[in-house]
């Protein structure tokens, strides 16, 4: 009897997932929401996207390329990035956009390892020498739920890549962003920031390590960084906003262990419930190019709309302290 009940429950769950999947498949799919626009909207604009070879970053790059932007893909694995760039050029050509030679929207691949401050500095030095302007910086790359490892500089990996690497990158490019104004900075965070806390006594997780907590902490740091940066950029005509993309089907969760027998059901449920990368990228695209947010800075967005933050994400004293400590950690000298 117990076995029959379990089997019935599993069949019911599977049937429900199939029904939802069918609804998702047959219902209207608004792939391009408010973040979309006409080809040419970003013509003449240079956009840097970190982690642009897969997932949200790739979808963001594809759409901004379609809109006519010159897109710089800052990626850790150059070979994979070159492969993705080739696919994006071909897709754009097939869709009737720019030709394979990139005469309208352009793609440039550059190596950038956010787990290495040396790599970040080398990347910025090269970019500052080669690029006369930078209109949009999208801090998209990230790691999630990885086992305890450290960056090249000895930082806990999730905090080091998700926060510190982008902190240094942004600071080194601020001069170019200011000279290119009006310009925008877009920071990709997560709703999971709600479960994070900034423990200044153990930012490197030497005392204890929890994958989920450390990811949430890094995403909370993204928001605090955005709000403090917005305060510092007042009057410069450079804006910075932060977003959550929702739950998206990407390879970001590759470190999450799912039992073998549960994988088919998980894959089906994720297909039914999770956003596609293009759907998840809409808020990044919206903040990068929409006239609706011109002059808007220091705000938190989801689904192309402003959302409220928990008080801990708006704590100005914590944001300032995190900024000061981050400057020391990455070696920025005043």
From Swiss-Prot:
Source species of the chain: Mus musculus
Lineage of producing organism: Eukaryota, Metazoa, Chordata, Craniata, Vertebrata
Keyword vocabulary terms for this entry: Lipid metabolism, NADP, Oxidoreductase
Q: What is this protein called?
A: Retinol dehydrogenase 14
Tell me a GO biological process for this protein.
retinol metabolic process
Q: Miscellaneous notes for this chain?
A: Shows clear specificity for the pro-S hydrogen on C4 of NADPH and the pro-R hydrogen on C15 of retinols.
User: Which InterPro entries does this chain map to?
Assistant: NAD(P)-bd_dom_sf, SDR_fam
Q: Where along the chain is the active site annotated?
A: 215
What Gene Ontology cellular-component terms does the record carry? cytosol; endoplasmic reticulum; mitochondrion; nucleoplasm
Locate the residues binding substrate.
190
Q: Gene3D superfamilies from the xrefs?
A: NAD(P)-binding Rossmann-like Domain (3.40.50.720)
Similarity comment: Belongs to the short-chain dehydrogenases/reductases (SDR) family.
Function, please? Retinol dehydrogenase with a clear preference for NADP. Displays high activity towards 9-cis, 11-cis and all-trans-retinol. Shows a very weak activity towards 13-cis-retinol. Has no activity towards steroids.
A GO term, aspect molecular function: all-trans-retinol dehydrogenase (NADP+) activity
Q: What EC designation does it have? A: 1.1.1.300
Recorded catalytic reaction(s): these are:
all-trans-retinol + NADP(+) = all-trans-retinal + NADPH + H(+); 11-cis-retinol + NADP(+) = 11-cis-retinal + NADPH + H(+); 9-cis-retinol + NADP(+) = 9-cis-retinal + NADPH + H(+)
Residues where NADP(+) binds = 51-57
């Amino acid at each position: 009897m117990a076995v029959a009940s379990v089997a019935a429950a599993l069949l019911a769950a599977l049937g429900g997932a199939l029904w939802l999947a069918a609804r998702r498949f047959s219902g209207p799919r608004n792939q391009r929401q408010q973040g979309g626009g006409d080809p040419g909207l970003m013509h003449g604009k240079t956009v840097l996207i970190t982690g642009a070879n897969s997932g949200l970053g790739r979808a963001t790059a594809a759409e901004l390329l379609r809109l006519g932007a010159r897109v710089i893909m800052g990626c850790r694995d150059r070979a994979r990035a070159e492969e993705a760039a080739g696919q994006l050029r071909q897709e754009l050509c097939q869709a009737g956009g720019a030709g394979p030679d990139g005469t309208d929207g352009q793609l440039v691949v550059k190596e950038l390892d956010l787990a290495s401050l040396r790599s970040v500095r080398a990347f910025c030095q090269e970019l500052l020498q080669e690029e006369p302007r930078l209109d949009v910086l999208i801090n998209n790359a990230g790691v999630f739920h990885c086992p305890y490892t450290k960056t090249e500089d000895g930082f806990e990996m999730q905090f080091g890549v998700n926060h510190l690497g982008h902190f240094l990158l942004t600071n080194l490019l601020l001069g170019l962003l200011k000279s290119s104004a009006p310009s925008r900075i877009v920071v990709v965070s997560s709703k999971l920031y709600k479960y994070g806390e900034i423990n200044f006594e153990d930012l490197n997780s030497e005392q204890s390590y929890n994958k989920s907590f450390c990811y949430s902490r890094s995403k909370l740091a993204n928001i605090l960084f955005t709000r403090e940066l917005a305060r510092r950029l007042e009057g410069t005509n450079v804006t910075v906003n932060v977003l959550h993309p929702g739950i998206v089907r990407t390879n970001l969760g590759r470190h999450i262990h799912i039992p073998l027998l549960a994988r088919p059901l998980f894959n089906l449920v994720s297909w039914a419930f999770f956003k596609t990368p293009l759907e998840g990228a809409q808020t990044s695209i919206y903040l990068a190019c929409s006239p609706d947010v011109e002059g808007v800075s220091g705000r938190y967005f989801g689904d192309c709309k402003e959302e409220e933050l928990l008080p801990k994400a708006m704590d100005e004293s914590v944001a300032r302290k995190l900024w000061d400590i981050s400057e020391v950690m990455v070696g920025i000298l005043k």
